[in-house]
């Protein structure tokens, strides 16, 4: 990142971890001087409402009225994705301050999203670490498989949120193999007819959600209890439990699968 210049003007992404400074329901706009940012470093990461968008180097001690990134899923996709870019870039920079090959200090490259080792004898270049995770909706006839994960424990007597299955891709594994493995590990079910649906950047802290649709093949539900509280089949015409929020690829997968169920 470069030192911010007094004349730099645009929208500014200021954040700590996944908390965004979002006053008046938008990012702050103005010159660096008017926003008291001239002592900071930043990088331009795109355009926001026709103006440059800068992400400011993260300061963990910064105190502001924050808005959780998850709550901004309601924004148009292109805006939410830009916020993810900035948050992930700062996460990459703060976790790669030193070269993983020789241990010397790194600095951000000028020609691409990367950090460059400052040891002339090394010069190793490291790129942002993006951890792909599959997310899959499984259909059986007119039914959809939904699960209540341990991180969505029911509260106040409710049923808790039910959603799709997901998991990280392992080394030497295709996305389709990950779908098969994750579904089987978490529920004991085998799936077939796996097909790509879409993807979503997910800065929690550095994932890429890769969405798939799949059909039930065989097996009975057997829970991986350290991951799931419950998993069951829901008929497309019956009342559904609490679902993921708008803007998530999980809800898009669920809605797409329900539409297929109703046409089956």
UniProtKB/Swiss-Prot annotation:
UniProt organism field:
Actinobacillus succinogenes (strain ATCC 55618 / DSM 22257 / CCUG 43843 / 130Z)
What protein does this entry describe?
NAD-capped RNA hydrolase NudC
Tell me the residue numbers annotated for binding a divalent metal cation 2.
Answer: 182
Which Enzyme Commission numbers does its entry carry? 3.6.1.-, 3.6.1.22
* Protein's job: mRNA decapping enzyme that specifically removes the nicotinamide adenine dinucleotide (NAD) cap from a subset of mRNAs by hydrolyzing the diphosphate linkage to produce nicotinamide mononucleotide (NMN) and 5' monophosphate mRNA. The NAD-cap is present at the 5'-end of some mRNAs and stabilizes RNA against 5'-processing. Has preference for mRNAs with a 5'-end purine. Catalyzes the hydrolysis of a broad range of dinucleotide pyrophosphates.
Key words of the record: Hydrolase, Magnesium, Manganese, Metal-binding, NAD, Zinc
Tell me the cofactor note: Divalent metal cations. Mg(2+) or Mn(2+).
Cofactor(s) needed, names only, are: Mg(2+); Mn(2+); Zn(2+)
The short motif Nudix box is annotated over 167-188
On subunit structure and binding partners, the annotation says: Homodimer.
Q: Give the first-level EC class, as a single word.
A: hydrolase
The segment(s) forming the Nudix hydrolase domain are 128-257
In alphabetical order, the GO MF annotations are:
magnesium ion binding; manganese ion binding; NAD+ diphosphatase activity; NADH pyrophosphatase activity; RNA NAD-cap (NMN-forming) hydrolase activity; zinc ion binding
Q: Which residues are involved in binding a divalent metal cation 3?
A: 182, 186, 227
Gene Ontology CC terms, in alphabetical order = cytosol
Binding positions for a divalent metal cation 1? Answer: 166, 186, 227
Give residues annotated as binding substrate.
70, 112, 127, 200-207, 250
- Member of which family? Belongs to the Nudix hydrolase family. NudC subfamily.
Query: What processes does the entry annotate via GO biological process terms?
Result: NAD catabolic process; NADH metabolic process; NADP catabolic process
Q: Which residues bind Zn(2+)?
A: 99, 102, 117, 122
| Reactions that this protein is recorded to catalyse | a 5'-end NAD(+)-phospho-ribonucleoside in mRNA + H2O = a 5'-end phospho-adenosine-phospho-ribonucleoside in mRNA + beta-nicotinamide D-ribonucleotide + 2 H(+); NAD(+) + H2O = beta-nicotinamide D-ribonucleotide + AMP + 2 H(+); NADH + H2O = reduced beta-nicotinamide D-ribonucleotide + AMP + 2 H(+)
Give a yes or no for keyword Manganese in this entry: yes
Q: Which PROSITE patterns match?
A: NUDIX, NUDIX_BOX
